[in-house]
């Protein structure tokens, strides 16, 4: 059996299509666990109605605690040998589970690719493509997740349930929680990972979704996440490992870019900006980024005010091109 987990908070607009795409899977030996994470809208009632039509649906109601908390709750109730995470506002193709399940005898994690779409179904530009290029040992897997050669999102993949029995991702982390979960999983289990470059998962961006909300609090959550990764690598005695270091620099510079792009200022967290601008700065790693990222990062590296000018100009250009 395979367990599909759908955390849901105030998802009344989307939860029905999310659950129905699971019910329509060509692979039928599954259960669908919807975690109602303290919703104040009609999410619970919509799922209860669907539950009355198909016994494979299980509804778990809990006090709001966030995504990590909802996943932890679901993992206490799963019956499947493998778990598949699906966000409440996303959908998957009807042959997704069947296509991934054929590899479960030989692998612990089977990763599919995804499509990035807007609410009207238009496919958006996305540079992502899974490619496991740094090996299967722990160092190789750490490198793959740090450099995003394999997407870190827990959604859109089958994960052996035993790999998540010690799910210890901190509940207070709300940015980068999937990277953290993968790093912990590699540390504890060194999983066998299969990458499939077929986009079964449809990641849908809505204008008012949580991932599109930027404020100082969410910016600092990004800093908190980057610091967690640094601390983790330090505890593993890998902070200065010659194989890990470039991929760690990649992650830190990438997070620094999004921190700046979304309105972050050096005064918000001088220590983080200093780490990115000096200790973890690497021109060779920077060359792997798209030109607009390089422009912003190099401008800030030279002068904060120049960086702000370039960032704002690129943000205006991005809006005009939408």
Residue ranges and their predicted role:
Residues 11-24:
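Short, well-formed alpha-helical segments that are part of the catalytic scaffolds
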Residues 36-46, 63:
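A conserved acidic beta->alpha catalytic loop
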Residues 62-78:
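Glycine-rich, basic loop-to-helix element that forms the pyrophosphate-binding segment
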Residues 83:
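Short aromatic/hydrophobic "clamp" motif used to bind/position activated sugar donors
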Residues 96-172:
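Flexible acidic/His/Gly-enriched loops in nucleotide-sugar-dependent glycosyltransferase catalytic domains
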Residues 139-217, 222:
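Conserved nucleotide-sugar donor-binding catalytic segment
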Residues 200-206, 212-240, 254-281:
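Catalytic core of nucleotide-sugar-dependent glycosyltransferases
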Residues 262-322:
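Membrane-interface aromatic/basic loop that binds lipid-linked glycans or pyrophosphate carriers
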């Amino acid at each position: 059996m395979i367990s599909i987990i759908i955390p849901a908070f105030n998802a009344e607009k989307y939860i029905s299509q999310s659950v129905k795409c699971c019910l329509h899977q060509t692979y039928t030996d599954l259960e669908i666990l919807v975690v109602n994470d303290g919703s104040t809208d009609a999410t619970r009632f919509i799922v209860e109605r669907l539950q009355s039509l198909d016994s494979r649906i299980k509804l778990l109601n809990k006090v709001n605690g966030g995504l990590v908390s909802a996943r932890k709750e679901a993992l206490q109730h799963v019956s499947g040998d493998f778990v598949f995470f699906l966000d409440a506002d996303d959908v998957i193709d009807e042959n997704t589970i069947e296509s991934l399940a054929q590899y479960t005898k030989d692998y612990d994690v089977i990763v599919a690719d995804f499509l990035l779409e807007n609410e009207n179904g238009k496919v958006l530009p996305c540079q992502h493509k899974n490619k496991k290029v740094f090996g299967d040992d722990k160092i190789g897997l750490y490198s793959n997740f740090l450099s995003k050669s394999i997407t870190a999102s827990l959604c859109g993949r089958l994960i052996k349930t035993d790999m998540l029995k010690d799910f210890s991702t901190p509940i207070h982390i709300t940015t980068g929680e999937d990277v953290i979960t993968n790093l912990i999983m590699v540390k504890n289990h060194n999983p066998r990972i299969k990458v499939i470059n077929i986009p079964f998962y449809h990641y849908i961006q809505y204008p008012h979704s949580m991932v599109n909300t930027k404020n100082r609090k969410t910016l600092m959550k990004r800093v908190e996440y980057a610091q967690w990764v640094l601390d983790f690598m330090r505890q593993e005695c890998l902070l200065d490992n010659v194989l890990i270091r470039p991929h760690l620099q990649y992650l830190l510079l990438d997070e620094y870019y999004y921190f700046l792009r979304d309105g972050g200022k050096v005064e918000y967290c001088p220590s983080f900006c200093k780490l990115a601008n000096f200790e973890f700065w690497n021109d060779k790693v920077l060359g792997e980024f798209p030109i607009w990222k390089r422009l912003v990062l190099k401008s800030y590296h030279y002068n904060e005010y120049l960086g702000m000018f370039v960032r704002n100009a690129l943000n205006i250009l991005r809006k005009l091109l939408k």
